[in-house]
Amino acid sequence: MTMAACYANYDMSSLSHGMSALSALQQQQQQQQQQHSQTQQQHHHQQQQQHMYHAAVAAHQQQLLQQQQQQQHHRHHHQPANTSSSSNSRHSHAAATQTQVAAAVANSRQQQQQQQQQQQQQQQQQTASSNSNAAPAPSPQKDYSIPLHVDCSVEYELPNQPKPPAGQRVEPLLMIHPCYFRKMESQRRSPFVNNMHATARAVSSSSLSSGAALGGGGSGAAVATAPSSSAARRGARAATSAQQQQQQQQRYQQQQQQLRQQHQQMSQMSQQAHYPQQQSSLVRQHQQQQQQQQQQQRASSNQSQRQSQSQSQSQSHAANSAAAAAAQASIAAAAAGQWDQLAALAARTALTPHHMLHPHSHYAAKGSGGGAGGGKRDAMISGSYGQTAVASGKLQQSQVQQQQPQQQQQHCLPPPPWDATSMLMDRSPMATVPSNYQAGPDTNPMRLYSATPTAGAASGGSASVGGGGAVSGAGATGAVNTATDKLSGKYRQYLRSQRMHPYAAAASLNLAAAAAAAGQTSFVPFSSAATAVAATPTFQHLPQISCYNV
């Protein structure tokens, strides 16, 4: 019985089935002894069945059954007495009739139960006989017709788990392989960002399309595909209209004109993000208006110059539009050349040209004290993103507009050169991972620009930005050795076989520096820092033999 109970424990259905099979076997044994009267046997069986099936109700039912049995025994004793000696005293006859009435009531109740029981018995006999035909059971305890509980899911149980109390089943640990679980988890939709309010989502998408806060999303892509000559013509047209409007120089008209031009400027912002050199004189004049309160005399002289310039431009445009279009198309072509070089990099680095062309928006945000783009991802998660984004975007945009012409006018340098940190590091926590970490040696972002130092700008600027005094050599070597530069993992592996051991190299350089400071020139271990990369015999023909995985 123990094994059968263990198997039956899995399933309440299999439990009841096994119990009925057991009772059927007992019934067969009982039916072989048919000497008992059938009513008694059925009573006995009814007691048994009710005991097994409803263990909770058992006490109450047993009381009922005992009452019925007593009444039946009365009936069995009294009925023959009634029939044989009808000449007995009236007293006993009255008592007998009373008991007979009670017994008749009980009888009608019993006959229904008996009919139900007989039907059950017949069914159980049939099932039992078919069972014994199919698989003759060696022990009456186990019924092999019930299929075992088979479950394909793999469950492990921890070895030291305490055994469950009897009648409870073991709590299975359903083991999912962690890799699979991690994959499915990463494919779920995030509960945070997707639940942004509809308003916040709309606002953030509108700021995207305006191209102000983040380098142009949809509109920027569309503009990039448009031919650059049409963009140039559009810029020239806007410039002529702006110049006609600007010939009255009163302040209130300037303010009205700002309102009027803001729509044009919004449409041109995405163009600026992609073609910065092409900045039409419209935007420059607009920015100068903003600055006029501070430097009025200088701005007025500049503006008169620019007005004459743009006037001649507009006249030539009216005379022969082809020549002016060609003149601006040349600017656009120069910008597009740089743009292609940048796009090639951006395709590899997954950076927006907006970031790469205006890195000083980075500096502007740093200088203004509140990093505008700072907690963007956290704000999106907490849901407060939509409210702040647009305002901070406009603020940052105006800051950039004010700072840019100042830089261009005061010292006529190109905007400060790109350094690896401001490119690879956006200040959201996910961007700490460089996102190109699997691309090969060519992806090193400094290599593109430092190898071709444009007009000495790279060597001059990267000294101020990056490694400080260490850069003092040629621009190329300095920028490649910049301390902040991170190389990708594969590239580091690929270098490792051809490089001197890093500790040894550092030690030799430190020795050289110390010796130079002490003034001994007698022993210079490999090189002075200036000629380091150029003339050093760094054992590059030897493979590096070392067990260090540095």
From Swiss-Prot:
Residues 21-145, 208-320, 361-380, 392-465 are annotated as: Disordered. Homodimer. Interacts with esc, Trl, E(z), scm and ph-p in vitro. Found in vivo in an esc-containing complex, which may be the Esc/E(z) complex. Also found in vivo in a Pc-containing complex that may be the PRC1 complex, but does not interact with Pc directly. Interacts with cyclin CycG. One of its GO terms (cellular component) is polytene chromosome. Its main location: nucleus. It comes from the Eukaryota. Residues 24-71, 81-136, 221-320, 396-412, 450-462 have a biased composition (Low complexity). Keywords: Cell cycle, Cell division, Chromosome, Coiled coil, Cytoplasm, Cytoskeleton, DNA-binding, Mitosis, Nucleus, Transcription, Transcription regulation. This is Centrosomal and chromosomal factor. Essential protein required for proper condensation of mitotic chromosomes and progression through mitosis. Binds to specific polytene chromosome sites, many of which are shared with the posterior sex combs (Psc) protein. Involved in maintaining Abd-B repression outside its normal expression domain. It is found in: Nucleus; Cytoplasm, Cytoskeleton, Microtubule organizing center, Centrosome; Chromosome. One of its GO terms (biological process) is heterochromatin formation. Residues 20-44, 105-126, 239-274 form a coiled coil. It comes from Drosophila melanogaster (Fruit fly). GO terms for molecular function: chromatin binding; DNA binding; identical protein binding; protein homodimerization activity.
